[in-house]
Amino acid sequence: MKYRFLLAPAMLLTGCTLGDPGPKISPMAEIKVVNNNICLLAPVADGESMSALEIRTVEPEKNLRKHFTPPIFLSSTACTPLFGYRFQAGHNYGIFVNTERRNAQGKVVDARIIRASFRLGQDKNGKLQVITSTE
């Protein structure tokens, strides 16, 4: 009996997350430069939509975070909308896209975080190029 009283507070303090419906981390997205703009190709399935977007760099004032209601539908063959974010050569970036799929009743049945991490440079003509990409 004494051990039950010790076990209960220990379980409460550990923050047990059994059955946590949080999003899964998925494979890295592909980063390309198209018309001197960054293009993120997300490995999404049919019916998957973007509920949030975060673009991070070492300068906190240049970070971007957006939430979308209703979510924006994505395609694995089209660039993910980055809303005119101004990427600059010589900087490192991380992009995180929260995606979700809903059933016919509108309930979220699956959620993922798609991510990309990369450094930008410039070629001799001043065009952006991806120097490194973590995949």
Feature names for model-found ranges:
Residues A8, E30-I31, T69-I72:
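Secretory-pathway extracellular proteins and peptide precursors enriched for disulfide-bonded cysteines
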Residues L12-G15:
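C-terminal motif of bacterial Sec signal peptides marking the signal peptidase cleavage site
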Residues T17-G19:
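Bacterial signal peptide processing site
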Residues K2, I25-P27, N63-F68:
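Short, intrinsically disordered, charge-biased short linear motifs at domain edges
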Residues L41-E135:
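Acidic, low-complexity Ser/Thr/Gly/Pro-rich repeat segments typical of extracellular/periplasmic
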Residues K24-G47:
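Contiguous beta-strand segments within globular domains
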Residues K2-P9:
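Sec-dependent signal peptide recognition
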